Structure formats: C-alpha cells, structure tokens
Amino acid sequence: MTVQTSKNPQVDIAEDNAFFPSEYSLSQYTSPVSDLDGVDYPKPYRGKHKILVIAADERYLPTDNGKLFSTGNHPIETLLPLYHLHAAGFEFEVATISGLMTKFEYWAMPHKDEKVMPFFEQHKSLFRNPKKLADVVASLNADSEYAAIFVPGGHGTLIGLPESQDVAAALQWAIKNDRFVISLCHGPAAFLALRHGDNPLNGYSICAFPDAADKQTPEIGYMPGHLTWYFGEELKKMGMNIINDDITGRVHKDRKLLTGDSPFAANALGKLAAQEMLAAYAG
C-alpha cells in the first residue's frame, strides 16, 4: 500500500501565516544524503586567497496571497560547492547584508550525509557569526585576498540582496579585478543589485532556476503562494542571457562567472569552481 504524502504547505509556528514546503515536495526534492562526489584535488592551493560567501540573512519571503514562505539559503547549494573549494585549498569567509546570522532552509539539510554534515559543523560558526558586507566592501581593493565571490541559492536570496548597494559594489569589484563569481539556482537574483548602475555583467550568459519552474512549485505545496516577481525576467532586462529553460543539473562558465541551474548542479558547480580556481591560482 502506497502512503500518499500531503501537498499542503506545512505551518511554520515561529511566525504568523508562514509555511515550510509540503511533505510531498520535500519527498521529491530533498534527500538525507547528498550526491557529493569527485572530491579529488591531489595538489591543493596553499596560498592566501579565499572565498567571500554572500549569504541570506532573512527567512520569510512574502508570496502573492500574503502567506510567507519560510526560506533562506539552500544547504546543498551552499555546502557542496564550498566542500569542493575547501578540499581544493580555498578557505572561505561569510558575510551578510546586516551582519546577522545566515538563514538556512534546514528542511533541505542532508542530515545523514557523513561528509557534508561534519563539514557544516566545522564551519557553522562562520555562518552564525558572519561579517557585515558593508565592512567587507569598505576594505576591498586590487590587492584584497578574495579570489571569488560565491552567492548560494535558496529563495532567501530574493530578499534584500537584489536591492543592496553593498552586493552591487562587491560584484563590481570582483568583475573589474578579474576575480571569480560563483552562483546557482536563485543565487543569481543577487546580480540584480547591478541593474541601477554600473553593470559589468551585461552580456554574460548564466544557468539559473527557471521562472517557469518557480511558477509551478505552488501546485505541489513547495511554496504557499506564487512569487510576486520573477528574477529571471529581471535579469534578462539588464542584459543577461539565461541559457537553460529546465532543471538538469547544468553548469556554465562565461569568463570567470560560474553558474548552475539548481541544487542538482551543486556538486558539478563545486567541481568546476575548484578546477577553474586551481588553474588560476595554483597552476
């Protein structure tokens, strides 16, 4: 006998009118163990360059019916790329717009993963005690030790980051100083911070989570309502080209901009980023 799981969003009792994804959607799109593999970097980087992670610091995303989606950064999209980069020799720092702790979608945490969970525990303090992004931006110059900026996905990236002048300044610094920018799924929504000023990403191609897929997720209770705007439409308006219209785990490199389409791309993006950064900094 097959037990049917509910497609109704689950109540988040920590906030009024807030909801987690339905049991059904979690059964389809999350797993207690990740697909981490291919972590093989026999000649890791030994220098001072590191990664700046720009993380989400807000949990609740309003939808079109007034209900709140309980979100944050997706753990797989955050931790798998970082696992590869760390294994390749690159340490990382975490910053949020407010300087307050990173919010994670804990309902997507691979809690039985014997590699990812110890890695998360080892670095949890960085996410709990991030730097304030404005302070990081104020210190940036051509000699700064950040080799890359990494913006993880999760719908939490839609909150605050697309309007942040500090996010814009960090991205402008990275592109103009020949650093890497790494992102996946909803993370590229942060690139919208560039739309009202100098936009060095104009003309770049990326993979990202398709707007069409976001429009379907309320049907299975992943979100409690529809989004009030769609980041893919807005990225196209600012001159970016989204090369995927589905979710296949695809990754893409355009110069030093490295992107993936979804959590299914997290492992491949980690491999790509580690290989590209080793070639640039340890070659």
Curated annotation (Swiss-Prot):
Location in or out of the cell: Cytoplasm
Species per Swiss-Prot/TrEMBL record: Escherichia coli (strain 55989 / EAEC)
Induction conditions: By heat shock.
Transmembrane segments: none
Enzymatic class: hydrolase
Main subcellular location: cytoplasm
Family: Belongs to the peptidase C56 family. HchA subfamily.
Single GO term (MF): protein deglycase activity
GO biological process: DNA repair; methylglyoxal catabolic process to D-lactate via S-lactoyl-glutathione; protein repair
HAMAP family the UniProt entry points to: Deglycase_HchA
Gene transcribed to yield this protein: hchA
Name of the protein described by the UniProt record: Protein/nucleic acid deglycase HchA
Protein's job: Protein and nucleotide deglycase that catalyzes the deglycation of the Maillard adducts formed between amino groups of proteins or nucleotides and reactive carbonyl groups of glyoxals. Thus, functions as a protein deglycase that repairs methylglyoxal- and glyoxal-glycated proteins, and releases repaired proteins and lactate or glycolate, respectively. Deglycates cysteine, arginine and lysine residues in proteins, and thus reactivates these proteins by reversing glycation by glyoxals.
UniProt-listed InterPro entries: Class_I_gatase-like (IPR029062), HchA (IPR017283), Prot/Nucl_acid_deglycase (IPR050325)
PANTHER family in the cross-refs: PROTEIN/NUCLEIC ACID DEGLYCASE DJ-1-RELATED, PROTEIN_NUCLEIC ACID DEGLYCASE 1
Higher taxonomy: Bacteria, Pseudomonadati, Pseudomonadota, Gammaproteobacteria, Enterobacterales
Signal peptide: none
